[in-house]
Amino acid sequence: MKGEHVAVLMGGGSSERSVSLSSGTACADILEARGYRVSRVDVDSHIASVLERLQPDVAFNALHGPFGEDGCIQGVLEYLKIPYTHSGVMASALAMDKGRAKIVVASVGVSVAPSCIMSRFAVGREHPMEPPYVIKPLCEGSSFGVVIVKENESAPPRNVVGAEWVYADEVIVEKYIPGREFTCAVLGNEALDVCEIFPDKHFQFYNYDSKYKSGGSLHICPAQLSPNIYQNVQRMSLAAHQAIGCRGVSRSDFRFNEETGELVWLEINTQPGMTPTSLFPDIAKASGRTYGDIVQWMVEDASCMR
């Protein structure tokens, strides 16, 4: 058994702290049940000295958001020469930047929505494109800060320039693609099943509450799609995973407009949530793998120089 002592890194100081704690706790429980010695580490600025003291065989990265999935913690682990799960420094940093990741993925022939990167203050002055469109913080996850500008809104959005905006000034603005929402996970070099997401009717879109509250969304896996579209989602997910340079696991999100036949890649997640309501465990189950199988596979796959 590789990595008998596993340090599960969780928590941290990002806006996704609670998600990370839930993911990390669930993964730590599984690893302990499978015979690993587990150290549960709530990450802070002293993480390097903590890891030097613990001397784990493997670091399981259950962090989400800045520092956890943007190449920072990966760089610390490379410096300490501790094998770790998920993607490496370069792929993590690139995937976290939604705009630049989209440029790279589009370069290998994956269809993406028209978009631009700009200052939130410029967005607040005038529409950057014809509504409807979506505004997202450039480097956040879990749908934090997402603003949907509807078709008939004449004035540009003001909530991106007010004091309530707690994210970076740079945002990505992309054309809103109506239709069905899908996600597909990649494990190693294999695209797993495609899952369709139905947010509860109380939510405008698949936002934070829809993702993490019990009953907030319905996951249909495998998705009911024509074989051609299903295979295209899998192909595009694997292409994005490889173009970004991901290792271990990733999950790509899509929109499909049945009226026009348009299938669009939205973004990639190099640290898919592993909470009880997360998509990745559901996809793994549909593919014939248990939650525990996936978590143990990640530990066995851990390495440096990723």
UniProtKB/Swiss-Prot annotation:
It is an enzyme of class 6 (ligase). It is found in: Cytoplasm. Mg(2+) 1 binds at D253, E267. The keyword Transferase does not apply. Cell wall formation. Belongs to the D-alanine--D-alanine ligase family. This is D-alanine--D-alanine ligase.
